[in-house]
Amino acid sequence: MKVSVLITLAVLGVMFVWASAAELEQSGSDQKDSDSPAWLKSMERIFQSEERDCRKMFGGCSKHEDCCAHLACKRTFNYCAWDGSFSK
């Protein structure tokens, strides 16, 4: 019983943060700077997707720079595969 209550509260908290970030994203930039608290502005960054110009796992490539981080272009069939690294 206690576990289900804690899980429910955690899910509600995540939904609140997600909804707040989505609302913040929809509002104009003028309103975003003046009305919202600083912690909400920082939470917005979590829900924004990164737009990268790279190929993901098993994507076609011609050189290593075409692939995303921790991926390398395999010469055999020209696809991006894990390069074996773990660091940032």
From Swiss-Prot:
Secretion signal, residue range per the UniProt entry: 1-21
Keywords assigned by UniProt, alphabetized: Disulfide bond, Ion channel impairing toxin, Knottin, Secreted, Signal, Toxin
Cell compartment(s), UniProt: Secreted
Organism: Chilobrachys guangxiensis
Gene Ontology CC, one term: extracellular region
UniProt function note: Probable ion channel inhibitor.
UniProt family annotation: Belongs to the neurotoxin 10 (Hwtx-1) family. 41 (Jztx-36) subfamily.
The name this protein goes by in its record: U13-theraphotoxin-Cg1a
